[in-house]
């Protein structure tokens, strides 16, 4: 049985390893001949764990300030310099209420059991008791590790691909398809990964699109032909049906709010009369009585009331699974043909996505012009012979800004990293915001641009919505996760960039700026378009995405 001390050492070794091969080898060597492989891998990937602990960094600080009888303000200030695990370790070492253990005695199984119990409680008094109990059997480094598991970030600079491919060279690709970690580990030991496929009622990583700024680029990407599909301005939904059971997952593989999808339980059996079990890739959009899509964000309960004659409508664009048959390895044109055979449209409720078979550049230009004239968001271009590759960016998206010569081909989904006090009438409140992106290579957040221009009502809401720490432009208080040049040090930084808001930022063009740290990339005349509530930091524009956008 693996001890927590052994696990901590593994995490430390992974962090200091120089690259993908070395990190994966460390993990592979560690798990060889161990009976608790699944537990080790599961805890190395806390971000994939579906347990919910009902506490963010600020709440953890609050609870441990009570347990340690330390100043919550002092602990929050310390958090501003680094990470939650380091703060808890520092104050655990200094506290006089609970003496840290001299030697580590916990097993990984005991830690996992604690995490399961913690996820089952919501009352603050119960959380305090559990956190006190675990601290009483921890060394300082033990508790740091436990807190980082609660925070779902071990900071080892090794994501799912590094960890899973230590089990088997193709384990990561299989996981993106099946999303079943336990099954992958069990089958890898039997050298039987090929037998794993899609499982109905278990979410699949959705296939994605990268930006495209020219018709010519599209034909280079798909020389054998493509489908041009309307890019709907709604919410991506993966529909699962198994007999009379239904499940609906967002692009983040989280359950969709019931008020958005409950109606589908009535209509899906009518649209798919022959289907016992099925998995669909689709977009749910609010449409008017003429089946014309309404604006993004109108799916909310209160927004929907503004459109009295509207309906929720499911635009179906792919079938991934049908009655026990995994269809992801079948070419798109065959999947689409099959979908036409098995689905009966229900007007304004369940319909096919609008799709055009493109054979030349002028045809694609005409289809794009038509989409933009109808005030649609743009097009998604798909290889006519392409298989469905979960989690891969194999499609292209071409949006309305494409036609504006010299303008950005696509917006960027950036994370709010900090804020500055406004001037004049906006003095004393956060009015200008520092936007940035995540650098997968360094594990740091880099700055891209500053953004302002919100109306007064929005600014009032943002004061409460954004969880910030005041640093008063003090370089010494810049958190470890942020790389920012002196000229852009903000008045406030977010408590946790991975929990911060994601904003769609558009502008005149991408430009070069030595003052910003995202490889010198910035945005000329940036403007806030909308909050991307449907995305987490993982789906935001990362640095490598930004580089690709500028190359385009």
Curated annotation (Swiss-Prot):
Active site positions, chain numbering: 231 (n6-amp-lysine intermediate)
Cofactor dependence: Mg(2+)
First-tier enzyme category under EC: ligase
Localization terms from the record: Host cytoplasm
UniProt-listed Enzyme Commission number(s): 6.5.1.1
General function of this protein: DNA ligase that seals nicks in double-stranded DNA during DNA replication, DNA recombination and DNA repair. Recruits cellular topoisomerase II to sites of viral replication and assembly.
Residues engaged in binding ATP: 229, 236, 283, 382, 397
Name of this chain's protein: DNA ligase
Quaternary structure and interacting proteins, as annotated: Interacts with host TOP2A and TOP2B.
A Pfam family assignment: DNA_ligase_A_N
Family to which the UniProt record says this protein belongs: Belongs to the ATP-dependent DNA ligase family.
InterPro entries for this protein: ATP-dep_DNA_ligase, DNA_ligase_ATP-dep, DNA_ligase_ATP-dep_C, DNA_ligase_ATP-dep_cent, DNA_ligase_ATP-dep_CS, DNA_ligase_ATP-dep_N, DNA_ligase_N_sf, NA-bd_OB-fold
Binding site for Mg(2+) 1: 283
A GO cellular component entry from the record: host cell cytoplasm
Reactions performed catalytically: ATP + (deoxyribonucleotide)n-3'-hydroxyl + 5'-phospho-(deoxyribonucleotide)m = (deoxyribonucleotide)n+m + AMP + diphosphate
């Amino acid at each position: 049985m693996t001890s927590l001390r052994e696990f901590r050492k593994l995490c430390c070794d992974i962090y200091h390893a120089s690259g993908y091969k070395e990190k994966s080898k460390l993990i592979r060597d560690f798990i060889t001949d161990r009976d608790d492989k699944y537990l080790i891998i599961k805890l190395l990937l806390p971000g994939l764990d579906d347990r919910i602990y009902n506490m963010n960094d600020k709440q953890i600080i609050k609870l441990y300030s009570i347990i340690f009888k330390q100043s919550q303000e002092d602990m929050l200030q310390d958090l501003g310099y680094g990470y939650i695990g380091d703060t808890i370790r520092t104050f655990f070492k200094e506290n006089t209420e609970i003496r840290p253990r001299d030697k580590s005695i916990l097993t990984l199984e005991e830690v996992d059991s604690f995490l399961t119990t913690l996820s089952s409680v919501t009352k603050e008094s119960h959380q305090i008791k559990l956190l006190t109990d675990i601290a009483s059997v921890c060394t300082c480094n033990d508790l740091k590790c436990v807190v980082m598991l609660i925070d779902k970030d071990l900071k080892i600079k090794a994501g799912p691909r590094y960890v899973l491919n230590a089990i088997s060279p193709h384990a990561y690709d299989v996981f993106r398809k099946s999303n079943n970690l336990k099954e992958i580990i069990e089958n890898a030991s039997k050298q039987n990964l090929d037998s794993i496929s899609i499982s109905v009622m278990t979410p699949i990583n959705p296939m994605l699109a990268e930006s495209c700024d020219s018709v010519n680029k599209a034909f280079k990407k798909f020389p054998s032909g493509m489908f041009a599909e309307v890019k709907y301005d709604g919410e991506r939904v993966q529909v699962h049906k198994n007999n009379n059971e239904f499940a609906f997952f967002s692009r983040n593989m989280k359950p969709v709010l019931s008020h958005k999808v409950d109606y589908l339980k009535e209509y899906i059996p009518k649209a798919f009369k022959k289907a016992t079990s099925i998995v669909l890739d689709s977009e749910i959009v609010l449409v008017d009585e003429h089946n014309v899509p309404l604006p993004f964000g109108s799916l909310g309960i209160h927004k929907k009331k503004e459109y009295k004659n509207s309906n929720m409508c499911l635009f179906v664009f792919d079938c991934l699974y049908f009655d026990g048959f995994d269809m992801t390895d079948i070419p798109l044109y065959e999947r689409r043909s099959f979908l036409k055979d098995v689905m009966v449209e229900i007007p304004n409720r369940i319909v096919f996505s609008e799709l055009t078979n493109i054979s030349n550049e002028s045809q694609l230009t005409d289809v794009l012009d038509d989409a933009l004239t109808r005030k649609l968001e743009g097009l998604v271009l798909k290889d006519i012979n392409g298989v469905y590759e979960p989690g891969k960016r194999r499609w292209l998206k071409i949006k309305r800004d494409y036609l504006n010569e010299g303008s950005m081909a696509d917006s960027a989904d950036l994370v709010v990293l900090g804020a500055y006090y406004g001037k004049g009438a906006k003095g004393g409140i956060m009015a200008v915001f520092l936007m940035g992106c995540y650098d997968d290579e360094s594990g740091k957040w880099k700055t891209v641009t500053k953004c302002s221009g919100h109306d007064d009502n929005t600014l009032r809401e943002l004061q409460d919505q954004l969880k910030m720490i005041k640093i008063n432009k003090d370089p010494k208080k810049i958190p470890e996760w942020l790389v920012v040049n002196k000229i852009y040090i903000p008045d406030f930084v977010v408590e946790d960039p991975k929990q911060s808001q994601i904003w769609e930022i558009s502008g005149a063009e991408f430009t070069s700026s030595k003052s910003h740290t995202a490889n010198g990339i910035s945005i000329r005349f940036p403007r806030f378009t909308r909050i991307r509530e449907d995305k987490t930091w993982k789906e935001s524009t990362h640095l490598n995405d930004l580089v690709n956008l500028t190359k385009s």
